[in-house]
C-alpha cells in the first residue's frame, strides 16, 4: 500500500540522516542525494528558479538575506502563493514612535523600538529602545535590551540580549549569538 511504502521510505531516509550525523556530515545534497544517487532509488524534481542548498551557517545567513530582495519574495509569495507555514494567530508587528525599519522583514508579534536595517526578524521578538540591528537574522522569541548594537549576526531563538550589548561580525565573519554565548563563524 502507499502508506507502507511512504513509511518505509521515511525509515530509510531517517537512517541515512542519522548515519550522516554520526559521521559529522550535514550537507543533505552532497552527503545523501549525491552520495547515494547510484545506490538508492532517488527521484527529484528539477527546479528552474530559486533554490538554495543550506549546508553551513553562511548558507543559512545568505539564504535568509535573499528574502530581502523583491524578486525572491515575489517568487514565493506572488508567483507561487501556495507556500504554507505554521499559522500563529499573532498581532501584526508593532513599530513604536522613533523606530525605523529599512529593507527588512519583520514577522508578526514583534515589537520594534529601535533601528532595523537589512535584517530578518522572526516572530515574537522584541527590539529595545535605541537599538541598532543591521544585516542580521533575529530568530523567534528574542528579547533585545535597550541601547544594543547587533550587526552581521544570527541570534538564536529564545535568547535574551542584555541592555548595552555590542555584537558585530566583521566583513564575511558572522557571529552566532546562542543563549548569551558568542560563536564566531
Give residue spans per PLM region.
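Left-handed beta-helix
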Residues: 19-185
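A generic structural signal for short hydrophobic patches within well-formed alpha-helices
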Residues: 10-17, 60
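Single conserved hydrophobic/aromatic residue that forms the stacking wall/gate
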Residues: 1-9, 13
Amino acid at each position: 500500500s502507499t502508506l507502507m511504502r511512504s513509511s518505509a521510505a521515511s525509515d530509510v531516509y531517517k537512517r541515512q540522516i542519522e548515519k550522516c550525523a554520526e559521521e559529522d556530515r550535514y550537507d543533505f545534497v552532497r552527503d545523501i542525494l549525491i552520495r547515494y544517487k547510484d545506490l538508492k532509488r532517488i527521484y527529484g524534481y528539477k527546479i528552474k528558479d530559486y533554490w538554495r542548498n543550506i549546508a553551513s551557517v553562511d548558507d543559512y545567513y545568505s539564504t535568509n538575506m535573499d528574502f530581502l530582495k523583491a524578486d525572491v519574495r515575489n517568487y514565493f509569495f506572488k508567483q507561487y502563493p501556495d507556500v504554507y507555514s505554521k499559522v500563529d494567530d499573532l498581532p501584526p508587528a508593532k513599530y513604536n514612535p522613533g523606530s525605523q525599519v529599512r529593507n527588512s522583514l519583520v514577522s508578526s508579534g514583534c515589537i520594534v523600538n529601535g533601528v532595523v536595517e537589512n535584517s530578518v526578524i522572526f516572530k515574537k521578538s522584541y527590539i529595545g529602545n535605541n537599538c541598532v540591528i543591521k544585516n542580521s537574522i533575529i530568530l523567534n522569541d528574542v528579547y533585545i535590551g535597550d541601547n544594543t548594537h547587533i550587526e552581521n549576526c544570527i541570534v538564536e531563538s529564545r535568547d535574551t540580549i542584555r541592555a548595552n550589548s555590542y555584537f558585530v561580525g566583521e566583513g564575511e565573519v558572522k557571529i552566532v549569538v546562542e543563549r548569551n554565548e558568542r560563536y564566531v563563524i
